[in-house]
Amino acid sequence: MIRLYLQATKPGIVLSNLMSFIGGFLLASKGRINYLIFLVTLLGVLFIVTAGCVLNNIIDRDIDRKMERTKNRPLAIGSISILTCLIYALICSIIGIYLLYNYTNKLTMLLAIIGLIVYVGIYTKCMKRQSIYSTIIGSFSGAIPPVIGYCAVSNQFDTGALLLLLIFCLWQMPHSYAIAILRLQDYQAASIPILPIKKGIRITKNHIVIYIVAFIVTTILLNISGYTTSYQYLIVTNFINFWWLYLALQGYKEDNNDILWSKKMFIFSIIAITSLSLMMSLDSIFSR
């Protein structure tokens, strides 16, 4: 039974959000880490993201049943109680907000609340089934954890926080569009109006390339603005990011298999954001 409730939290999404949070926190810390604040904020983000994922699963349980990828989720097949999950999400939300309010700062708590509301209330409940632009809204909520990490240290929403928000928003778009192409039939079965369905795969590929270019520019701006200072950051992130762009451009080949290509794009998007978070975390060490 515990395993089923764990599945309802979407562990993969929770883990990726924690990883980006760590990147933002260590970037702002610049080698001077307050381990108590780090641990408490990490737990706060863990509880908030968990709450968001559980609520998302509750709201999406009907469309999850129509999609091959999600049809066996616990809430979709009714193997766990909706009421219990609601209570679970509420408790996680309260604990997360309490930790952030009492041990970090009001800005960090506010960002977490905004991220939760945007993800659950605006993206999942209002826009996901109605608009192709829901992906943009979802990207905002997905970009909040690294900003929380940064602001937990800085206690201000400055240029660094804005750049992190832009970087992770821009990354989410090609990542999500790759999934959309890869799972196109699932989204069609669930009648979700994603870009590849409404505008076509070719247009979606154009968007992917544009967003990756913008992502590359903002990751470089993070260095130009002095928030990262090591040459290792520039070398590693640019190598991986330009390779990601190269893979994106391969999608225009006449003999391209869109399913295989989108799978490669999805996998490489994870490599790109993981390497970015890692290099942000290690930048202060490399800069010594």
UniProtKB/Swiss-Prot annotation:
Cellular component GO terms, alphabetical: plasma membrane
Subcellular location: Cell membrane
Pathway: Porphyrin-containing compound metabolism; heme O biosynthesis; heme O from protoheme: step 1/1
Record has Cell membrane as a keyword: yes
Class of this enzyme: transferase
Domain of life, source organism: Bacteria
Membrane topology: Multi-pass membrane protein
GO biological process, one term: heme O biosynthetic process
Entry GO MF terms: protoheme IX farnesyltransferase activity
Main location as per UniProt: membrane
Reactions catalysed: heme b + (2E,6E)-farnesyl diphosphate + H2O = Fe(II)-heme o + diphosphate
InterPro entries: Protohaem_IX_farnesylTrfase (IPR006369), UbiA_prenyltransferase (IPR000537), UbiA_prenylTrfase_CS (IPR030470), UbiA_sf (IPR044878)
Transmembrane intervals: 8-28, 35-55, 80-100, 107-127, 132-152, 162-182, 208-228, 229-249, 266-286
EC number: 2.5.1.141
Record keywords, A-Z: Cell membrane, Heme biosynthesis, Membrane, Transferase, Transmembrane, Transmembrane helix
Family under the similarity heading: Belongs to the UbiA prenyltransferase family. Protoheme IX farnesyltransferase subfamily.
Function according to Swiss-Prot or TrEMBL: Converts heme B (protoheme IX) to heme O by substitution of the vinyl group on carbon 2 of heme B porphyrin ring with a hydroxyethyl farnesyl side group.
PANTHER family with a match to the protein in the record: PROTOHEME IX FARNESYLTRANSFERASE, MITOCHONDRIAL
Additional remark text: Carbon 2 of the heme B porphyrin ring is defined according to the Fischer nomenclature.
Protein name: Protoheme IX farnesyltransferase
